[in-house]
Amino acid sequence: MAKEKFVRTKPHVNVGTIGHIDHGKSTLTAAITKYLSLKGLAQYIPYDQIDKAPEEKARGITINITHVEYETEKRHYAHIDCPGHADYIKNMITGAAQMDGAILVVAATDGPMPQTREHVLLARQVEVPYMIVFINKTDMVDDPELIDLVEMEVRDLLSQYGYPGDEVPVIRGSALKAVEAPNDPNHEAYKPIQELLDAMDNYIPDPQRDVDKPFLMPIEDVFSITGRGTVVTGRIERGRIRPGDEVEIIGLSYEIKKTVVTSVEMFRKELDEGIAGDNVGCLLRGIDKDEVERGQVLAAPGSIKPHKRFKAQIYVLKKEEGGRHTPFTKGYKPQFYIRTADVTGEIVGLPEGVEMVMPGDHVEMEIELIYPVAIEKGQRFAVREGGRTVGAGVVTEVIE
């Protein structure tokens, strides 16, 4: 049987449900697919299928994530849901499934809880740009003023972490009532679900496609071609490249080399242009083979700089996940795998009051590399020691 072709007729947007355990994230995900299945825009995925999320690996870390897809009249959505709190943290830090917007689920019976706050903080740090709130289980609260109070608390919480708390759409409803409702899409139990989908369509803008961002390609390999010059190969991370374009070679020192790409090739054929996602070779004008190496990046002039020091949120693998068996302190020196660069770095700063970091923790720390690498906020990386992954991180702030 031939694979079904993915037809791009509607803009594609990645979303996910976040929030405290048992506040109804998976039930809401099920309710969305049920409602849209009645309109012929999705396949219904029941709660028990969402809850037993399959395992996947990202940067050497195992994460349980459920992916569902559905459409509205306007868009195609890929929606992620994680069963466990640790899975959310690992997903956000590794960027296994990136989100253009998040649906924060808060139970009206509880209001914001510790994990609510933690998920919002992480969403801010990894730059999830838009947030929509679904106040769930409203059928279990008799006094509407209590729901108003929960809404105020959630708006305050979002504002605290840099989201526009006053503007964020807040929808009230019961995901369970929608899941249990009859199969008539006009039934009133589905109204909040439709409101939520309208908010997603209208409040989360179409994401900027990777191909429209400034060009960047991590260098994987370098070859010398007699009579032609030096070729660097890699997978284009973002943007586009055409013969004649000026680029910079960045990383491994503070010196930035400028050059021109004279030819772009894929499978030994010359291309008019390489775009995000393509594996290409770029022929560089006037660059010797020993002037460029794996771990550097080729980038649009002025778009990224080399740095040694940065702050990052790091998830430290548990022993059971193949991580360290013992805690570490300031001064710990593992390897950092940043794009194609593999560089030693030192933990030079931990949060106030944190003396040691235990396997299973996630902590913001300051890192100093032994040489500069092309780094920017939101950059994901792996932490390795003795040939095994011991952690995963995301850059939250570049220092120098």
Curated annotation (Swiss-Prot):
Q: Where in the cell is it found?
A: Cytoplasm
The record ties this protein, via Pfam families, to: GTP_EFTU (PF00009), GTP_EFTU_D2 (PF03144), GTP_EFTU_D3 (PF03143)
What EC numbers are recorded for this enzyme?
3.6.5.3
Q: Which residues form the tr-type G domain?
A: 10-208
Q: Write out the catalysed reaction.
A: GTP + H2O = GDP + phosphate + H(+)
Q: Which InterPro entries match?
A: EF-Tu_GTP-bd, EF-Tu_GTPase, EFTu-like_2, EFTU_2, G_TR_CS, P-loop_NTPase, Small_GTP-bd, T_Tr_GTP-bd_dom
EC top class, in one word? hydrolase
GO CC terms, sorted: cytoplasm
Region G1, as annotated, extends over: 19-26
- At which positions is GTP bound? 19-26, 81-85, 136-139
Which intervals of the chain are annotated as region G5? 174-176
Predominant location category: cytoplasm
**What is one Gene Ontology biological process annotated in the Swiss-Prot or TrEMBL record?**
translational elongation
What keyword terms does UniProt attach to this protein? Cytoplasm, Elongation factor, GTP-binding, Hydrolase, Magnesium, Metal-binding, Nucleotide-binding, Protein biosynthesis
Region entry G2, spans: 60-64
- Which HAMAP family does the protein's record reference? EF_Tu_B
Q: Which family does it belong to?
A: Belongs to the TRAFAC class translation factor GTPase superfamily. Classic translation factor GTPase family. EF-Tu/EF-1A subfamily.
Functional note? GTP hydrolase that promotes the GTP-dependent binding of aminoacyl-tRNA to the A-site of ribosomes during protein biosynthesis.
Protein name from the UniProt record:
Elongation factor Tu
- UniProt lists the gene as tuf
